């Protein structure tokens, strides 16, 4: 009694197609699919960034040595 039958769903689908047209519905579907793909891609990138963040910090001496070698390289290139 309280449920929606297949015929009622079919009538609703026909009305939606008549109101919006197939081209607009196709465009909405592709936009929705693109949004879902983008969301999944962003979630995967976030996971990889978390993995990259799991590193051991360098000591200050190592950081100073690296900065010195980088500045020497920059001076040589200029």
Curated annotation (Swiss-Prot):
Its main location: membrane. Residues 60-69 have a biased composition (Polar residues). It holds the Pfam family TatA_B_E. The keyword Cell inner membrane applies. GO terms for cellular component: TAT protein transport complex. The chain crosses the membrane at residues 1-21. It is found in: Cell inner membrane. It is a single-pass membrane protein. Residues 47-78 are annotated as: Disordered. This is Sec-independent protein translocase protein TatA. The lineage of its organism: Bacteria, Pseudomonadati, Pseudomonadota, Gammaproteobacteria, Vibrionales.
